[in-house]
From Swiss-Prot:
NCBIfam families from the UniProt entry: PRK00415.1
Zn finger limits (C4-type): 10-32
Signal peptide: none
Organism: Halorubrum lacusprofundi (strain ATCC 49239 / DSM 5036 / JCM 8891 / ACAM 34)
Gene name tied to this protein: rps27e
GO cellular component: ribonucleoprotein complex; ribosome
Organismal lineage: Archaea, Methanobacteriati, Methanobacteriota, Stenosarchaea group, Halobacteria
Listed cofactors: Zn(2+)
Gene Ontology molecular function, alphabetical: structural constituent of ribosome; zinc ion binding
Name the record gives this protein: Small ribosomal subunit protein eS27
Pfam families per UniProt: Ribosomal_S27e
Family from the record: Belongs to the eukaryotic ribosomal protein eS27 family.
Length: 57
C-alpha cells in the first residue's frame, strides 16, 4: 500500500501529530480532540496545517 505520513499541526492547540495520508477513519487531536483529518475514499482531507511530510512512499 503506497501512502505518505504527514506531520499535521492542530489549529486549536498547536499540537503536532503524525497522520497517514490515506486515513480510513477520522483522526482527532490527541490533546484537544479537534478533527485533524477525515477520510475521502482516497487521500484524506486535512483540517490542520501540514508541517512536513515525514515519510513519502
Amino acid at each position: 500500500m503506497a501512502g505518505s505520513f504527514h506531520r499535521v499541526a492542530c489549529g486549536d492547540c498547536e499540537n503536532e501529530q503524525v497522520v497517514f495520508g490515506k486515513a480510513s477513519s477520522v483522526v482527532s487531536c490527541a490533546v484537544c480532540g479537534t478533527t485533524l483529518a477525515t477520510p475521502t475514499g482516497g487521500e484524506a482531507e486535512f483540517h490542520g496545517e501540514i508541517v512536513e511530510t515525514v515519510e513519502a512512499r
